[in-house]
Structures are given as structure tokens and as C-alpha cells.
């Protein structure tokens, strides 16, 4: 019964897109609409499934590199903002991570202060960081063996102004944070000191880190105030669809949305790239 209701809702959403498609050709409006996505359990595996498809294609010799297999671009595409979906083959990284790149700098959010972690890392101080794009991509591939799926968006001047305003608003709620070199051992004198990921990010990717003094992002929680919500808060200022009314958006949900938007001829998403 509930599955039937879901597919009815999904069909209604797609029909709605068709009705309004012609009216939106060539337009990049700032109005946000509710978009119904696939069930969360299915959406969660999208990044990992995509990675597997790329790796399988490489093994079958369908291309010499992952880029030859995956990369696509619309005609005359000139993206001015990127969204990255991170994915690893194993572990929690298979669920994915989301950040954006704007004006040559990565903007990301997460529980990067390991010393503040609670609930097995599901909660902690919310940390926003900015990093050099090229250095960050190489850092992610080297440090975590990640594959990054990049989606280029072509925004209008009005949309870029809205994004600038939202970033400035978020930054006004933060103060700089200087991460320690190592994580505090849980059992001093027994446990070995481990390097702090945030410190390495600062040193190797020109990272600039910040903590929130107020706002919902002051505390990171994997099921609500997570990396996807921060990215959606910024990009949503440009008028992208609302993907959840419940507050939780998984990286896979966002990737599914970006993939679908890329297939639309006149959408904001104009390129797809893989970095492996």
C-alpha cells in the first residue's frame, strides 16, 4: 500500500515536471519546488552503485580511464558552480558525502573536530571549511581513496548573487577554528596519538576552518544538520528543488536529483565529471 502511494506521488511529480517544462525553457527561476525522490533506503546506495558501474566498465575495457566512461557535457556548457558527491568502495564512505566548489574554493561541512564527537561520530561540533579545489581533490583521493563525482551548474547572475548572499550569511555566523595537530587519545598513555584529519586538511589543501557561533549548523548531526543540508542551503538559494520536507537529505538523494536534472535539456546541471 505504502509503496503504491510512493509511486503515485513519484508519477505525479514527474507529470508536474512535464506540464511546467515548456514554460521554464530558457528560464532559471529562484522559486523552489518540492521534488519527490526515491525511498531513502534505495537513494542511500546510489553513490556506491555508480562507483561500481564505473569500475565494472573499466574492467570490461569500455574505456581506458574513468573519465572516458563517465564524463558528459551539454553543448556550450560553462558551469560556474560545482557539486561533488564523494564515495568510497567500503565503509561509511560508501553512503557518500557532499560539498560544493565556488570561485575555485571548496565549501564543506561536517564533524571535523574529532575531539567533539559523540554518539559514535554521529554528532559533534559543526565545522565549515574552505579549501583549494585542486589540492582538495588530490587530498581526498590520496587520504581516503575517494572517488568524486562532480556536477557542474550554470547559474545566472541573479542566481550567483543569491548564492553569494547565502554564503556571506553563513560565514557571518562563524569564527575561525585552528584544529590541533592530533586527536586527544581516549586513554592517555595507552592509546596512540592519531593525526587530526582537519589539521591535515589545513596543511595539505589550504584549508580554512570555522565553527558556528549560532544557527542549526552549530551542531553536526548525521541525520539532519549534515553535509548535504549545508550544500543545499547554499545551492537552494539559486532555486533548486526541495528534496525533503522532513529535513534529512542523503548524498544519494542529491545525486539522484542531479542526475535527473542533467538529462533535462534546459536545467541548471550542464556537466558530469569523475575524479578517481
PLM regions with names:
Residues 245-264:
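Polar, surface-exposed loop/tail segments
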Residues 94-95, 217-251:
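Active-site nucleophilic cysteine motif
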Residues 1, 9-222, 258-276:
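Non-catalytic ligand/cofactor/substrate-binding and regulatory segments of enzyme domains
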Amino acid at each position: 500500500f505504502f509503496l503504491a502511494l510512493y509511486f503515485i506521488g513519484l508519477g505525479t511529480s514527474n507529470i508536474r515536471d512535464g506540464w511546467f517544462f515548456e514554460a521554464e525553457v530558457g528560464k532559471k527561476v529562484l522559486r523552489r519546488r518540492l521534488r519527490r525522490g526515491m525511498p531513502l533506503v534505495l537513494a542511500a546506495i546510489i553513490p556506491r552503485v555508480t562507483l561500481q558501474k564505473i569500475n565494472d566498465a573499466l574492467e570490461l575495457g569500455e574505456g581506458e580511464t574513468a573519465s572516458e566512461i563517465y564524463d558528459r557535457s551539454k553543448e556550450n556548457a560553462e558551469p560556474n558552480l560545482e557539486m561533488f558527491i564523494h564515495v568510497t568502495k567500503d565503509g561509511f564512505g560508501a553512503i557518500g558525502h557532499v560539498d560544493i566548489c565556488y570561485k575555485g574554493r571548496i565549501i564543506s561541512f561536517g564533524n571535523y573536530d574529532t575531539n567533539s564527537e559523540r554518539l559514535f561520530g554521529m554528532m559533534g561540533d559543526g565545522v565549515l571549511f574552505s579549501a583549494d579545489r585542486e589540492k582538495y581533490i588530490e587530498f581526498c583521493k590520496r587520504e581516503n581513496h575517494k572517488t568524486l563525482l562532480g556536477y557542474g551548474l550554470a547559474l545566472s547572475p541573479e542566481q550567483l548573487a543569491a548564492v553569494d548572499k547565502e554564503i556571506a550569511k553563513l560565514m557571518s555566523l562563524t569564527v575561525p577554528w585552528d584544529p590541533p595537530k592530533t586527536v586527544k587519545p581516549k586513554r592517555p598513555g595507552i592509546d596512540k596519538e592519531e593525526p587530526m584529519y582537519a589539521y591535515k586538511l589545513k596543511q595539505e589543501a589550504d584549508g580554512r576552518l570555522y565553527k558556528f557561533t549560532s544557527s542549526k549548523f552549530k551542531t553536526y548531526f548525521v541525520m539532519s544538520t549534515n553535509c548535504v543540508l549545508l550544500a543545499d542551503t547554499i545551492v537552494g538559494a539559486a532555486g533548486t528543488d526541495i528534496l525533503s520536507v522532513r529535513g534529512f537529505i542523503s548524498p544519494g538523494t542529491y545525486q539522484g536529483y542531479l542526475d535527473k536534472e542533467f538529462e533535462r535539456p534546459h536545467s541548471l546541471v550542464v556537466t558530469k565529471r569523475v575524479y578517481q
